[in-house]
């Protein structure tokens, strides 16, 4: 009887892993960002990649020269050189949406969709890796 309870406990613990099993928080790139709305759900602008960029870790997007990039946020302060967005083909293609960061210097903004007038505080989920 005691062994069956121990076995049941082991099975239950292995079936429900802890909160860190699905991903991990990464260091914040910035404390604040500018967006088109409070949720940063509307794109600010559309840009074209001027060069290739290989993501150094899971917070960033790998971008290829010529790809269309939808910009959803622009980091402020120490992270001001990075913007957040999605590459065409990921967000509007068949695959799941993938948002990430990239250096603002590798893109050229071609079309403004909404002004980035909303100052939003970043949180742990902005830099969380799956």
Swiss-Prot record:
Pfam families membership: SH3_2
Signal peptide: 1-22
Keywords tagged on the record: Disulfide bond, Growth factor, Secreted, SH3 domain, Signal
Gene Ontology CC, one term: extracellular region
Residue ranges occupied by any SH3 domain in the UniProt entry: 42-112
Paired cysteines (S-S): 35-40, 58-129
Name of the molecule in the record: Melanoma-derived growth regulatory protein
């Amino acid at each position: 009887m005691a062994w069956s309870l121990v076995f049941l406990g082991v099975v239950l613990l292995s079936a429900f892993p802890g909160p860190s099993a699905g991903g991990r928080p990464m260091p914040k790139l910035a404390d604040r960002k500018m967006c088109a709305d409070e949720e940063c759900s509307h794109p600010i602008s559309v840009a074209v990649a001027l060069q290739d960029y290989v993501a150094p870790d899971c917070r960033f997007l790998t971008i290829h020269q010529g790809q269309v990039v939808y910009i959803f946020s622009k980091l402020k302060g120490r992270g001001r050189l990075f913007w957040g967005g999605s590459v065409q083909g990921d967000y509007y293609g068949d695959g799941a949406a993938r948002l990430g960061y990239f250096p603002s210097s590798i893109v050229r903004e071609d079309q403004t969709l909404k002004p980035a007038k909303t100052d939003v505080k970043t949180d742990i989920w902005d830099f969380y890796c799956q």
